[in-house]
Amino acid sequence: MDILKKSLFLVLFLGLISLSFCEEEKRENEDEEEQEDDEQSEEKRGLWKSLLKNVGKAAGKAALNAVTDMVNQGEQ
């Protein structure tokens, strides 16, 4: 009976160790995925920022050209 108890405890102990390693790897994988998601979000924000900046520049130039044309037409 003692041999069975010791064997059972050994199996349970090794199972718990294996389970803890699996959980640790799972957490590490989740952290890596989370970091990748954060990096992708930052890239998207950067793209939107540069896009809006370029649109703003183009709109400003177009407005300036329109005002300049109106002023030039008024002087003629």
From Swiss-Prot:
Distribution of this protein across tissues and organs: Expressed by the skin glands.
Domain of life: Eukaryota
GO cellular component: extracellular region
Positions of the propeptide segment: 23-45, 75-76
Biased composition (Acidic residues): 30-41
InterPro entries: Dermaseptin_dom, Frog_antimicrobial_propeptide, FSAP
Region (Disordered), start-end ranges: 25-45
Family assignment from sequence similarity: Belongs to the frog skin active peptide (FSAP) family. Dermaseptin subfamily.
Name of protein: Dermaseptin-S7
Organism encoding this protein: Phyllomedusa sauvagei (Sauvage's leaf frog)
Lineage, broadest ranks: Eukaryota, Metazoa, Chordata, Craniata, Vertebrata
